[in-house]
Amino acid sequence: MGKNQLEVIKAKLVSPETNEKLKVLPKWIKKDVLIAAFWNALFKNPQLQQCTPESLLNALLKCAEWGLLPGGDNVYLIPRHNNKKPGRPLECNAQRGYQGLIELIYRVTGAEVEAHVVYENDKFDYQLGTDAYVHHKPAPKNPGKPYLAYAVWRKDDKESFDIIRME
């Protein structure tokens, strides 16, 4: 990242306008922690460092709106060329990861969620309907290729699940 680009991004992050927008942060995330996590993600990916300052700020504000820290599996910061703008500028896009979705589901509904991947050599069985169940025993060695994923959520002694095939 060029020094000028870095200065522009820093100026955007500490501007009064940004401080006003970051007031949407939930109590459990401090502004300094969010910005530190954002910078950490930014410096781990050189392509993000080439993104427009405006798109980086928008990605930061999305993280604040969701109450999720970027990095890990909560929020992915993805650089993409915007083909609809002249010069196809590189822009940063914030996308919730599976752990971020699980966190939001828990916050909104109070439901506990587990997500798992099933591999070719795992023992896996499920049934839909009124007597629905999921049984999954991971292979102890050499799991093979992943072929489906599933999520189980629980709340108030009730359980439900959904299965997604990977094709």
Labelled PLM ranges:
Residues 4-167:
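Binding-interface segments
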